[in-house]
């Protein structure tokens, strides 16, 4: 019995030592991102939406701080449904079909104009369309000098960022959509998806299909166009769009339906 107790004590001590020495990845915020470290998002699914009438391909998304607005594409119809989602409990408030924004690859929200701005991407590749956030109807548009795949907006800077659809570049625009600066992207092996930003960083979503699996990364740049780092997104689905409210990050995916989740950022040890 004494030998068994000694053996058990030794095993217990070894287990405790291993536990104390084990590294645990630390949760961090977007503002904590810096060069040299390794980061990843762990996503928790909050909504799986079976949208009516063939609208099931998630594309761009944006938020006004209370609701999320998600574009669901119909390849059959060539337009989108806008899903308005209450972000307090992820219930769908409304579905607005037949919104003529083509592919609707990217979307931003401008609280100063109370408009959603959509990059149309396919049939009208240079066009950004404006949508009234209350009526969810198109109220106007602007033609850009280049093809645009995605768009985001930062209120404190009063500036937009757009990703080009014909090269590996992104541009910063003023509030009237005039180009202020253009920068090259570092990652060149992935397909560009939507884009997000805050006062500190610009987040460029990228996806690649590799051996039948989806590989998702988010490139992080500062507002001077400098590449800072990238975030790996741990998900088997194709990432489509991202927005965040403070430190609360919402990601949208496509996997045969619209999938929305909340993501926690971790710094890998």
Where are these regions (language model features)?
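Repeated scaffold domains used in trafficking and secretory/extracellular systems
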Residues: 54-62, 101-109, 144-156, 188-197, ...
């Amino acid at each position: 019995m004494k030998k068994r107790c000694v053996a058990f004590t030794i095993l217990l001590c070894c287990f405790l030592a291993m536990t104390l020495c084990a590294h645990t990845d630390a949760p961090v915020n977007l503002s904590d991102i810096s060069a040299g470290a390794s980061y990843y998002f762990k996503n928790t699914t909050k909504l799986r939406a079976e949208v009516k009438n063939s609208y099931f391909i998630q594309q761009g998304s944006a938020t006004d701080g209370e609701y999320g607005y998600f574009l669901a594409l119909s390849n059959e119809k060539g337009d989108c449904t806008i899903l308005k989602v209450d972000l307090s409990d992820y219930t769908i408030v409304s579905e607005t079909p037949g919104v003529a924004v083509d592919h609707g690859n990217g979307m931003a929200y401008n609280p100063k104009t109370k408009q959603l701005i959509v990059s149309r991407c396919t049939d009208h590749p240079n066009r950004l369309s404006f949508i009234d956030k209350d009526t969810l109807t198109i109220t106007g548009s602007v033609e850009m000098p280049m093809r645009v795949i995605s768009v985001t907006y930062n209120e404190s800077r009063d500036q937009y960022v757009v990703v080009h659809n014909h090269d590996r570049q992104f541009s910063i625009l003023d509030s009237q959509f005039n180009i202020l600066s253009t920068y090259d992207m570092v990652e060149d092996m992935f397909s560009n998806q939507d884009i997000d930003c805050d006062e500190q960083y610009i987040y460029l979503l990228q996806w690649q299909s590799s051996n039948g699996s989806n590989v998702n990364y988010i490139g992080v740049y500062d507002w001077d166009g400098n590449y800072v780092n990238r975030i790996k997104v741990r998900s088997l689905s194709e990432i489509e769009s991202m927005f965040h409210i403070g430190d609360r990050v919402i990601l949208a995916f496509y996997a045969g339906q619209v999938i929305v989740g909340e993501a926690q950022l971790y710094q890998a040890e």
